[in-house]
From Swiss-Prot:
A Gene Ontology molecular function term of the record: nicotinate-nucleotide-dimethylbenzimidazole phosphoribosyltransferase activity
Gene3D superfamilies (alphabetical): 1.10.1610.10, 3.40.50.10210
Name of the top EC class for this enzyme: transferase
PANTHER family for the chain: NICOTINATE-NUCLEOTIDE--DIMETHYLBENZIMIDAZOLE PHOSPHORIBOSYLTRANSFERASE
Pathway listed: Nucleoside biosynthesis; alpha-ribazole biosynthesis; alpha-ribazole from 5,6-dimethylbenzimidazole: step 1/2
Keywords: Cobalamin biosynthesis, Glycosyltransferase, Transferase
Highest classification ranks of the organism: Bacteria, Pseudomonadati, Chlorobiota, Chlorobiia, Chlorobiales
Organism: Chlorobaculum tepidum (strain ATCC 49652 / DSM 12025 / NBRC 103806 / TLS)
Active-site residues, as the UniProt record annotates them: E319
Catalyzed reactions per annotation: 5,6-dimethylbenzimidazole + nicotinate beta-D-ribonucleotide = alpha-ribazole 5'-phosphate + nicotinate + H(+)
Protein name from the UniProt record: Nicotinate-nucleotide--dimethylbenzimidazole phosphoribosyltransferase
Length: 353
């Protein structure tokens, strides 16, 4: 497994920045004042560079919602019981969750991935069964996952991305479902980015002040308990992460390895993106951060990464909802690039010198 993982990292190539001048020249020749479409121009520029072409296409999109349970839920860090994770997976499979509505609206296919739910699901056309284990261990008592389990989850995610590329998908989005998963996400941020736990710990599913203080203490305890196992990004992910987070990390790495951009959802998915960036800094050129989460700490994370999310809608649901929304903005930017007339083709006079 380690050899395959190293091969995956080695296969991630830097983007070709030489495309920038050609893409910019085309954008500047469209029938509008230069730069007047603002961030839409930045977004399609990044999309072109990530996909390695000056003639971008975007017709096939997919959202992957990774699900997993967390042993740390036993510490009482969430307002909801752990059994909500499988219940919400069933809701998604039945078409009733927010991500079902928004992925349909975006014209994106949706697949739910069981990475580590503490429940056994029957086969379903929307469900991919990649279960590593029935939930992670309690990270407040020791590592959430072993290195081998973490690598298994990463490689499963990577294989999903590579398969999607082979099926003709051009843009992927991440989502997640897992009760208590803001707790490992916060621990990952604190450890990998050096952010103070108390400043970035949020209310997640809506916990009160007393439980929020308890959540901070649990995260600080988990980091201290696992202090000896935090030497590398992979060890940090294993000790303080979760199966769905590792799966998303793998999806990002796999997509980058085949030159495919990924739209990262909110607070949880961004923690997986941080793990991927720490494992291979090159992947950041393939990432679109979809939205600024309303979850406390996400703004500090985005600032630390130097990232500017596409949307700011006070979202804090997860599931891939923000990513599905942002997919539509990316698609609009590609259509602008491809479908607008140029000054010469439209017979419109350019700017006076």
């Amino acid at each position: 497994m380690t050899d395959r993982f190293q091969q995956l990292l080695a296969s991630i190539k830097p983007v070709d920045m030489n495309l920038t001048s050609t893409v910019k020249a085309h954008l500047d020749d469209l029938t509008k004042p230069q730069g007047s479409l603002g961030r839409l121009e930045e977004i399609v520029m990044k999309y072109c560079i990530a996909t390695g072409t000056t003639k971008p296409s975007l017709s096939k999109k997919k959202v992957f919602c990774f699900a997993g349970d967390h042993g740390v839920a036993a510490e009482g860090v969430s307002a909801f019981p752990a059994e909500v994770t499988p219940q919400m997976v069933y809701n998604m499979l039945g078409g009733g969750a927010a991500i079902n509505v928004l992925s349909r609206h975006a014209g994106a296919d949706l697949e739910v991935v069981d990475m580590g739910v503490n429940h056994d699901f029957a086969e379903h056309p929307m469900l991919r069964r990649c279960k590593v284990k029935h939930g992670s261990a309690n990270m407040a008592e020791g590592p959430a996952m072993s290195i081998e389990e973490t690598l298994q989850a990463i490689m499963a995610g990577a294989e999903l991305a590579i398969e999607a590329r082979n099926q003709g998908y051009e843009l992927l989005a991440t989502g997640e479902m897992g009760i208590a998963n803001t707790t490992p996400a916060t621990a990952l941020y604190a450890t990998l980015l050096g952010l103070p736990v108390e400043a970035i710990t949020g209310r997640g599913t809506g916990i009160d002040d007393e439980r929020l203080h308890h959540k901070v203490a649990v995260i600080e305890k988990a980091i201290e308990v696992n202090r000896a196992n935090l030497a590398t990004p992979l060890e940090v992910l294993a000790a303080l992460g979760g199966f769905e987070i590792a799966g998303i990390c793998g999806l990002i790495l796999g997509a980058a390895s085949v030159g495919m951009p990924v739209v990262v959802d909110g607070f949880i998915s961004s923690s997986a993106a941080v793990c991927a960036i720490k494992l291979s800094c090159t992947v950041s050129d393939y990432l679109f951060f979809s939205h600024l989460s309303n979850e406390q700490g996400h703004r500090a994370v985005m600032q630390k990464l130097g990232a500017r999310p596409i949307l700011d809608l006070d979202l804090r649901l997860g599931e891939g909802t923000g990513a599905a929304m942002a997919m539509q903005v990316i698609e609009a930017s590609v259509k602008i690039y491809n479908e607008m007339a140029t000054f010469s083709s439209a017979g419109v006079s350019g700017k006076n010198d």
